[in-house]
């Protein structure tokens, strides 16, 4: 069920360019290149099909827009993402995020990122995140209990209700379901502003109070206020059940013992709110939507969860939910939270046999990798069995990157999978989902989100 893309890549190297020549220039007209760059979920596929798995764009004069290389092969992804963060810096999208939301693990440049990563890495190990999962199934059960038998529901809205509730109850010590608007609207406003400025070659100065800038700053202030309330409540109540907040308070850089300041903790909580709101909820919504179109797959998920009995699921049950995990991997393949990953080369580097100059903006097309017919059989089909152990054997680790890869991969991947697994198994054990929406429309203001309601009918399952 998995193909190996090395044959195509090596043939491309031999036929298209000598080793360490510059990547071939993309033949599409400038207008189509610009449109593809702004379409994170499908644009890299368009550029790959026209210019090959490593293709160079020129979107304007170098003094205005740096050269861009789009990479869509496993080898190219490895060559970019596995490098030391000293060689691969964050780019202007991350600079815009840092300016608006403050310095956090996602947007910090190398010098600030390294001590922060050292301090936070122990918090997010697979062992530790299991301590954060106590309320996930409980929240999912409560959401399902709200649905009348035969209810018509928007899977996107309900998935956000589950993930926000689980995030708040399990790790932040706060009922975020009562703060839905406090989180949802500011998050969407902030990420849209960041993505628009990051992708635009011509940007108004940050000091200019444009309407978009004012809205974005107000959104950032709202998120920081909420993060401050979460931190203050945890400090005021020693018994508050807020394991992530307590872990951030206790975090120390193992090399120098430095702890995080309250301002640094607030910035990390803001990015965690952003990631927890959009990314996991979209994965859960997509998985539910896909199961609503594949009755046999849905029945297998339900049978797996039912085999654990009628009790509430716990993090310890994830080991017995292997097929449910495979369903989520397939959802992440077809709808990755981050359709592209970007870096800036700080020195000349080799990318899949091509020489890329310092200062080049590098775009790794995750969606393009995940849907490449040279790498996957029937790439557009929803088939969780492709992630069974036998079918995963021999797969290039760099062709499936739902959480990125290398030293700057997503630090919260274990918690995201824990949350999505327990939520999906709990929901499907309790209801049958029948999807009414034929497609799952996606927009990518920054991460992938549903672009319209995802309607389905939820029928109760007899205990």
Describe the role of every protein-language-model region.
Residues 279-298, 302-304, 413-430:
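Cytochrome P450 catalytic-core helices
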Residues 3-13, 48, 140, 188, ...:
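Cytochrome P450 proximal C-terminal region
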